[in-house]
Regions:
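Conserved ABC ATPase signature
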Residues: 149-153, 157
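Conserved ABC transporter NBD signature motif
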Residues: 74-83, 91
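Conserved ABC ATPase "signature" region
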Residues: 127-145
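The feature captures the beta-strand-to-loop junction immediately N-terminal to the Walker
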Residues: 52-54
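H-loop/switch region of ABC-family ATPase nucleotide-binding domains
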Residues: 206-207
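A short, surface-exposed alpha-helical micro-motif characterized by mixed small hydrophobic
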Residues: 212-214
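Conserved beta-strand-loop-alpha-helix hinge in the C-terminal portion
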Residues: 226-248
Length: 251
């Protein structure tokens, strides 16, 4: 069992209008492996939070629960709405999940069609769809790419388009899995600037501790399916015992 560390009295902020509340979430895979063991987490409007920990800690499993791809035991609420089978389409429109590999997210011939896919399947009028696509591409600074072929883009460009595909749904929460993986320094810097400027509540799973240090005021550490630390990033990065215990390195 991992050591639990108390790192900050500000770890679980009290606020009105919580964007995300996870309560005592448990999940085991069909082979019996226990991936989540009582995870609780709270994000408030405007929070930008890093989720770190070793491989197998449960980070990706947790993220897949936030829009109902996986369904464990416990409660997940998005903007005050409890995730249930009946409101699953609504929750999925409220949680923008961006996978580590953008090729898992981009499957249409053109950038426009990829970004328009979600709004079209919401049944929105054509004018609203076009407006959302334009706004999403502008947010990721890819307006000039709307007619480009998605599969011809670089990895960094694909990652930005993948973010646009969920921004076009106007989500309450943006969830990203390893967004900086595989990027060269220029593309990584572009991504950091983009994430910094996006005015949206954000939970980001990453092994990039320099990214954590630069971008996220708050960090949550997971290990063996549990939240073992939750606090101010500056405090966590100075806690050498914590970092060592959970296979993390100070940037």
């Amino acid at each position: 069992m991992p050591v639990t560390h108390i790192t900050s009295q500000n770890a679980a902020p009290e606020c009105d209008g919580d964007v995300l509340v996870v309560k005592d979430l448990h999940f085991s895979y069909p082979d019996g492996h226990s991936a989540l063991n009582g995870v609780s987490l709270k994000l408030c409007d405007g929070d930008k939070v890093a989720l770190v920990g070793p491989n197998g800690a449960g980070k990706s499993t947790l993220m897949l629960h936030l829009n109902g791809i996986l369904n464990g035991h416990g409660d997940v609420e998005i903007a005050g709405k409890r995730l249930t089978r009946d409101n699953l389409p609504l929750i999925r429109s409220m949680v923008g999940l961006v996978f580590q590999n953008p090729d898992d997210q981009l499957f249409s011939p053109t950038v426009f069609e990829d970004v328009a896919f979600g709004p079209l399947h919401m049944g929105l009028p054509e004018a609203e769809v076009r407006s959302r696509v334009d706004a999403a591409l502008e947010a990721v600074r890819m307006t000039s790419y709307r007619d480009r072929l998605s599969h011809h883009l670089s990895v960094g460009e694909k990652k930005r388009i993948a973010i646009a595909t969920v921004l076009s749904m106007q989500p309450s929460l943006l969830v990203l899995d390893e967004p900086s993986a595989g990027l060269d320094p220029r593309a990584r810097r572009t991504l950091i600037n983009l994430l910094r400027d996006l005015p949206i509540t954000m939970l980001v799973s990453t092994h990039d501790m320099k990214l954590v240090q630069e971008l996220f005021p708050r960090t949550v550490v997971m290990d063996e399916g549990r939240v073992v630390a939750d606090g101010l990033t500056a405090d966590i990065l100075e806690d050498e015992a914590l970092l060592t215990a959970h296979g993390l390195e100070k940037p």
